[in-house]
Design a protein with these regions (language model features):
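A short, Lys/Arg-rich alpha-helix, primarily the initiator
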Residues: 2-27
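Short basic helix-loop element that most often maps to the first helix and adjoining turn
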Residues: 19-35, 63, 96-98
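Short alpha-helical DNA-recognition segment
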Residues: 29-48
Length: 104
């Protein structure tokens, strides 16, 4: 399977989201344990992501991105990260061109 984006592009997107995790989570008033359950990781693992002790996988990034983008309040916060949403959509759009699926 070919890589859709290179490793440094993925790391940049992951770092951007990681830096925003505490604010995003607080904006919707849920605990680390609750969000960990939603995305299928332990609370300890999520906590390690949030404080930067562990880098999340690309799949975990996508789970968190979709979780936060689907909430109106956190969606607005993500829009303040200049170009972040557009960059993620470009990655997803590239993938979809190969599978004939279109994203907004």
């Amino acid at each position: 399977m070919e890589n859709i984006v290179n490793k440094s592009e993925k790391e940049e997107l992951i770092q951007t989201l990681t830096g925003a995790l505490p604010v995003l989570r607080a904006a919707i008033g849920i605990s680390q344990g609750e969000i960990a359950e939603y995305i299928g990781v332990s609370r300890q693992t999520y906590c390690a992501f949030e404080i930067g002790k562990r880098q999340m996988s690309w799949n975990t990034f996508l789970s968190l991105f979709l979780f936060f983008i689907s909430n109106a309040e956190t969606n607005n916060l993500l829009k303040t990260k200049k170009g972040f949403i557009t960059q993620v959509y470009k990655v997803l759009q590239y993938k979809s061109e190969q599978n004939s699926v279109q994203y907004p």
